[in-house]
UniProtKB/Swiss-Prot annotation:
UniProt EC number: 1.3.7.2
Protein name: 15,16-dihydrobiliverdin:ferredoxin oxidoreductase
Family: Belongs to the HY2 family.
Catalytic activity: 15,16-dihydrobiliverdin + oxidized 2[4Fe-4S]-[ferredoxin] = biliverdin IXalpha + reduced 2[4Fe-4S]-[ferredoxin] + 2 H(+)
Molecular function terms from GO: 15,16-dihydrobiliverdin:ferredoxin oxidoreductase activity; cobalt ion binding
Any one Gene Ontology BP term: phytochromobilin biosynthetic process
Gene3D superfamilies per UniProt: 3.40.1500.20
Organism (species): Synechococcus sp. (strain CC9605)
Lineage top rank: taxon: Bacteria
Amino acid sequence: MFDPFLEELLSGIKARGAVPVEVPHGLEHNQSSKRSSTIKSWLWDVPGFRRWRVTRLDAGDSLQVLNSVAYPDYTYDHPLMGVDLLWFGAKQKLVAVLDFQPLVQDKDYLERYFDGLKSLNAQFPDLNGEETMRSFDPNQYFSSWLLFCRGGAEQATSSLPTAFSAFLKTYWDLHDKAVKIPSSINPIEVAQLQKNYDIYSAERDPAHGLFTSHFGSEWSDRFLHEFLFPASQPK
């Protein structure tokens, strides 16, 4: 279901001069021994970004997942980009989260970087995030204008593809504008805020239990701390 979204995302990354980076050994691919599910992950070095990761889980009709997070270079203080798309076939349920994830919730920061996402939020009312996500505090590392829904097959094939394309374009536009203006947060603080994001996310990641059910706790714990949120690893 999400292959067209994956292709569009990777096409945009590659068009920006992305160079593949080696994924930690054993985490780039896994085949479930219990279920007919396969997970593949990619890591990219993209100009202007220190890290861009992508993960695709394919469990046939029962489950489909696409996840991606883009971490800007420390010299830029603009938001991270977060994508989470999940399809639960048995329940015919779509869960979609598309967000520019702010480093801080400061009013000036939000006014500086979120006009584009605000416009998308108004443009796609069925993805306007009015239903609060249960696993995360919307006032920390999530914006008030995220595109979020718990819908069905109709949204997965109608509004979501259009919203996804517009979301990616808007984020690229945000990045292109941000690199031309001085950051309001210094690089050392940006690095710490991105590290805090990893720690916060690793503690609350709702997909960890899902990965564990398919690939076991040992592999999934490694995947969480070594690939998804590597700055969460204790030193």
